[in-house]
């Protein structure tokens, strides 16, 4: 049986048999929310063979936490809302906010050519590539991953210098760690801080994300979950630009706080004006591919969504393939009637975050197994639809 940090008497017949539209007509109790979450996720966990998952649901102005299974099978350590999970590409949402903060504070401009921040790139293929293109995977075909031969700064710049685009900038979206990773590194370059320290000082600490890290300190190692692949424990090893593209670890408690800040930036305390503007700007609609709008890190769909379209878009057969995009010039400001989301994975972890600002609901799902994105999106949609 999956371990849960909630009462096991959640499923009682009178609630479970109500149709979802009946539940949504009045404000739900915590027990009703828990029933919806458990009825959706318990079968998913079993079917996907997921050892552990930490879930946070934001509803009725507050978070509710649900913890399942094991963070460390061998040690018998259960998942809690303080368990650290690898976020994989959900990290890109932090990089997006950090990049927009650099823009707000004047150390980077999205419309600048990349070469203004990387004089190492003297090849003619770079002359029309802007920072915005790197941030939105539209530079012209940078690959999903850097090659294994890139192991240090010298080989990194050699790689980018010899890279040849397949398309003109701003025409095709090709999801790429090599693209947004370089963006993150260059966006903070003029701060004179490392990317990790910049993120700590200007994003993590102001948002009070005290259990969110790129490098997990020794004092927090006991909270770090093991990921599992083929039943074996695994953890990520960050390669070049890994910090910027997939390097953040966090808890469900911190991630729901991060989600709240992104869902309602106006609620941030006074004195955080530039960070507030950065968060809002990260949800700007810069490019459109089908029904999907590309922000900085975040991907958005106009609400209400076509769920099957969003679910299909999340699968690797679409998400990782080149897609023709339309540049939105000027970028469309953040739209509150949006499904704002991001998936993420490492070899042993699978993460998902989604929220609907207009509806003031959202969910974070952190698992220590990489399982298919469409399964995550379907489950989150089912839960959020039942909460409305």
UniProtKB/Swiss-Prot annotation:
Active site: 89, 175
Name of the protein in its database record: Beta-lactamase
Function as written in the Swiss-Prot or TrEMBL entry: This protein is a serine beta-lactamase with a substrate specificity for cephalosporins.
Known EC number: 3.5.2.6
Location of the protein in the cell: Periplasm
Gene: ampC
Signal peptide as annotated in the record: 1-24
Additional remarks: The class C beta-lactamase family has a specific amino-acid numbering system known as SANC, for structural alignment-based numbering of class C beta-lactamases, or else the simpler name structural position. A multiple sequence alignment was used to derive a consensus sequence and then the consensus was numbered taking into account insertions and deletions. This allows use of identical numbers, e.g. for active site residues, despite differences in protein length.
Residue intervals passing through the bilayer: none
Superkingdom classification of source: Bacteria
Pfam families: Beta-lactamase
Binding site for substrate: 342-344
Family: Belongs to the class-C beta-lactamase family.
Family annotation (InterPro entries): Bact_CellWall_Synth/Modif, Beta-lactam-related, Beta-lactam/transpept-like, Beta-lactam_class-C_AS
Highest classification ranks of the organism: Bacteria, Pseudomonadati, Pseudomonadota, Gammaproteobacteria, Enterobacterales
GO molecular function: beta-lactamase activity
A GO cellular component annotation in the UniProt record: outer membrane-bounded periplasmic space
Enzyme kind, highest EC tier: hydrolase
Gene3D superfamilies per the UniProt record, alphabetical: DD-peptidase/beta-lactamase superfamily
Gene Ontology BP annotations: antibiotic catabolic process; response to antibiotic
Keywords: Antibiotic resistance, Hydrolase, Periplasm, Signal
Known catalytic reactions: a beta-lactam + H2O = a substituted beta-amino acid
């Amino acid at each position: 049986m999956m371990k849960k940090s909630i009462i096991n008497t959640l499923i009682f017949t009178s609630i479970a048999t109500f149709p979802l539209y009946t539940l949504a007509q009045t404000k739900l109790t915590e027990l009703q929310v828990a029933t919806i979450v458990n009825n959706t996720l318990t079968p998913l966990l079993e079917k996907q063979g997921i050892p552990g998952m930490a879930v946070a649901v934001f509803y009725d102005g507050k978070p509710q936490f649900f913890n399942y299974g094991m963070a460390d099978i061998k040690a018998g350590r259960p998942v809690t809302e303080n368990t650290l999970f690898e976020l994989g590409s959900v990290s890109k949402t932090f990089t997006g906010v950090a990049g927009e903060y650099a823009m707000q504070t004047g150390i980077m401009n999205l419309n600048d050519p990349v070469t203004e921040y990387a004089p190492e790139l003297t090849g003619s293929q770079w002359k029309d590539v802007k920072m915005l293109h790197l941030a939105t995977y539209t530079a012209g075909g940078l690959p999903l991953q850097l090659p294994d031969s890139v192991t240090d700064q010298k080989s990194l710049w050699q790689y980018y210098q010899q890279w040849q685009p397949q398309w003109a900038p701003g025409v095709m979206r090709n999801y790429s760690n090599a693209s947004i990773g370089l963006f993150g590194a260059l966006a903070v370059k003029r701060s004179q801080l490392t990317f990790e320290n910049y993120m700590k000082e200007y994003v993590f600490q102001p948002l009070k994300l005290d259990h969110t890290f790129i490098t997990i300190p020794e004092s927090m190692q006991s909270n770090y979950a093991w990921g599992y692949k083929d039943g074996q424990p695994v953890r990520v090893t960050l390669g070049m630009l890994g910090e910027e593209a997939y390097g953040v670890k966090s808890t469900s408690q911190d991630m729901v706080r991060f989600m709240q800040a992104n869902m309602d930036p106006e609620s941030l305390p006074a004195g955080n004006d530039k960070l507030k503007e950065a968060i809002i700007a990260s949800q700007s609609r810069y490019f459109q591919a089908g029904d999907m709008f590309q922000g900085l890190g975040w991907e958005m769909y106009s609400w209400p969504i076509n769920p099957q379209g969003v679910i299909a878009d999340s699968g690797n057969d679409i998400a990782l393939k080149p897609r023709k995009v339309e540049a939105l010039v000027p970028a469309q400001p953040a739209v509150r009637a949006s499904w704002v989301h991001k998936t993420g994975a490492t070899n042993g972890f699978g993460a998902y975050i989604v929220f609907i600002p207009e509806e003031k609901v959202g969910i974070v799902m952190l698992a220590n197994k990489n399982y298919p994105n469409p399964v995550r999106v379907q489950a989150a949609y089912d839960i959020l639809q039942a909460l409305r």
